[in-house]
Swiss-Prot record:
Name of the protein described by the UniProt record: Cysteine--tRNA ligase
Keyword Ligase (UniProt): yes
Cellular component terms per the entry's GO annotation: cytoplasm; cytosol
NCBIfam families xref list: cysS
Record organism: Bacteroides thetaiotaomicron (strain ATCC 29148 / DSM 2079 / JCM 5827 / CCUG 10774 / NCTC 10582 / VPI-5482 / E50)
Subcellular location: Cytoplasm
Entry's family note: Belongs to the class-I aminoacyl-tRNA synthetase family.
SMART domains per the UniProt record, alphabetical: DALR_2
CDD domains recorded: CysRS_core (cd00672)
Co-factor requirement: Zn(2+)
Length: 493
């Protein structure tokens, strides 16, 4: 490929040149949501981060198989091996079938992703649809001697595995650290070691979601699904596994252990993780109860929101920070993103107003601008630098439209292509349909306000002001009609 992409590999803690295992094919697996509630801003970040990666790899000419799973079973409360299944709990509280809960929130998740202009993955497998594959994975680990059965459940033997391999190589932990921070929960007596994690859990009598297995009627542990489904759709070795930084431990650490225990080596070449979105320095999350749903952002209905924010404002807000940086929510930051996005969209609209000249003014170098955008993307998806370059492009467009600079037809064509490529195709931004409607609504409010001022002027027999307002609006193309109830107006198009 022409462009050399480097990405930060969490496993090796450094940026590495991206070299696919089977070019031009790329296999990418990203951990999707556990669907027991509405998607929030924290869900938007990995979706947008890996959407940009998907878009860019595709642009570079790779044939990407992008797998993003749906967790609809096995994810217990507090990410532990005890407690109630998150989806089953929601179903019990709402007196629904678990799959009703899954389908309802999955539909809403898809709707939110569509609003954010997140492309659909190539495959979106459900954990509940791959129970057989997870049972087969558990059996392989048992056969290899790295798991044991206990009272109908099957646990991964972390201590035994750690003698042969390194448990903790992704997160940088050692087993003693893990043991010191492992909580003493109910049911730990089934385990040989508190750090052991469930591969299969025997279902209690009241547990709704259960499947038969060689060990018990039960359900798979949370970590099993991604290893099993990644292997099924991407093979025993694939290029990229992504997710939020909060998944490094225990989820992705356990995935590596399962992979190595069942096949002798790690399935994944590059581990990529986006950082968190925080509120007042604390991670935003459903389990913490401090989240704002995407619908609440779009509608402005949450008490912490000063206003509603469009999906593209949210997307732009996320892309203005590097994906490995923490982003702290604030209305001020979102409002700044809103203004910045509007500047870019207006600049793109301004491209169509430019009349090309014979030559391009000195100091305008479109090819360099395009090269710098590529350079930023190739440097571990540095979208903030891409945006900075596009703002420089916006400055150039505004200067040309103001008559302070000129641009040749060839350079204008390149500039248009650069903006459309990086703004729309790669970063996935778009001009929202509602934006022009919103502007028209705002204009309408201004006209109403002026005509109300005119009514006051007429009531005060200030005919000069009344006529001035009417004549000004008429000159701007508005037709004003006085009625017994006040006034009517329309814009003559």
């Amino acid at each position: 490929m022409e462009h050399q992409l480097t990405i930060y590999n969490t496993l090796d803690r450094k940026k590495e040149l991206f070299v696919p295992l089977h070019a031009p094919h790329v296999g990418m697996y990203v951990c999707g949501p556990t669907v027991y509630g509405d998607a929030h801003l924290g869900h938007a970040r990995p979706a947008i981060t890996f959407d940009v990666l998907f878009r860019y790899l595709t642009h570079l000419g790779y044939k990407v198989r992008y797998v993003r799973n749906i967790t609809d079973v096995g994810h217990l409360e507090h990410d532990a091996d005890e407690g109630e299944d998150k989806i089953a709990k929601k179903a019990r509280l709402e007196e629904l079938e678990p799959m009703e809960v899954v389908q309802y929130y999955l539909n809403r998740y898809h709707k939110a992703m569509e609003a954010l202009n997140v492309l659909s993955p190539s495959i979106e497998p459900h954990a509940s649809g791959h129970i057989i594959e997870q049972i087969q994975l558990v059996q392989k680990i048992l056969d290899a001697g790295y798991a044991y059965e206990s009272e109908g459940s099957v646990y991964f033997d972390v201590a035994k595995y750690n003698k042969d391999y390194h448990y903790g190589k992704l997160s940088g932990r050692n087993l003693d650290d893990v043991l010191n921070t492992t909580r003493d929960l109910d049911g730990q007596s089934e385990k040989r070691n508190p750090a052991d994690f469930a591969l299969w859990k025997k279902a209690q009598p009241e547990h709704i979601m259960r499947w038969p297995s060689p060990w018990s009627d039960g359900f798979p542990g949370w970590h099993a699904e991604c290893t099993a489904m990644g292997r099924k759709y991407l093979g025993e070795h694939f290029d990229i596994h992504g997710g939020g930084m909060d998944l490094i431990f225990p989820h992705h650490e356990c995935e590596i252990a399962q992979s190595v225990a069942s096949q002798g080596d790690d399935m994944v070449h590059y581990w990529m993780h986006n950082n968190m979105i925080t509120i007042n320095g604390t991670k935003m999350g459903k389990s913490l109860g401090n989240f704002i749903t995407l619908d609440e952002f779009f509608n402005g209905t949450h008490k912490l929101l000063a206003q509603a924010y469009t999906p593209m404002t949210i997307r732009f807000f996320i892309l203005q920070a590097h994906y490995r940086s923490t982003v702290d929510f604030s209305n001020e930051a979102l409002q700044a993103s809103e203004k910045g996005l509007q500047r870019l969209i207006e600049a793109i609209e301004g491209l169509d107003k430019i009349t090309p000249a014979a030559t391009t003014s000195e100091g305008i170098n479109v090819k360099e601008l395009r090269a710098k955008c590529y350079e930023a993307m190739n440097d571990d998806l540095n979208t903030p630098i891409v945006i900075a370059q596009l703002f420089e492009g916006a400055r150039i467009i505004n200067n040309i439209n103001a008559g302070n600079a000129t641009i040749s037809a060839e350079d204008l064509k390149d500039l248009k292509e650069t903006f459309h490529l990086f703004c729309f195709d790669i970063m996935g931004l778009k001009e929202e349909k509602g934006s022009s409607d919103g502007r028209e609504a705002a204009y309408g409010k201004v006209v109403d306000m002026l005509l109300e001022q005119r009514m006051k002027a007429k009531a005060n027999k200030d005919w000069a002001t009344s006529d001035e307002i009417r004549n000004t609006l008429t000159a701007l193309g508005f037709e004003v009609k006085d009625t017994k109830d006040g006034f009517e107006w329309r814009l003559n198009k």
